[in-house]
């Protein structure tokens, strides 16, 4: 994985982080879900544990991540094709 996420999408306290991974056959992407919560008065933490009320929102975030990745894969393929033609 890269040291910096390719993209983050957030709805409220839920977010997905999208990572771009470089492989021999091109880029591939992975998604990490997270839920932020406050411990005490001022310390924010993250967990990958979701409650019942989080599921539909996280489903929407996964849908948005899927769409973003699909567009990136298309852009990656176009760039590879143009690079191959230039060589």
Language-model-derived ranges and their functions:
Residues 1-87:
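Single-stranded nucleic acid-binding surfaces, predominantly the OB-fold ssDNA-binding core
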């Amino acid at each position: 994985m890269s040291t910096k996420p390719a993209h983050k999408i957030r709805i409220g306290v839920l977010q997905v982080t999208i990572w771009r991974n470089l492989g021999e056959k091109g880029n591939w992407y992975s998604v990490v879900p997270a839920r932020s919560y406050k411990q005490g008065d001022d310390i924010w933490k993250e967990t990958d544990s979701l409650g019942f009320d989080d599921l539909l929102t996280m489903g929407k975030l996964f849908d948005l991540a899927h769409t973003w990745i699909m567009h990136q894969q298309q852009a990656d393929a176009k760039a590879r094709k143009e690079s191959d033609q230039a060589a």
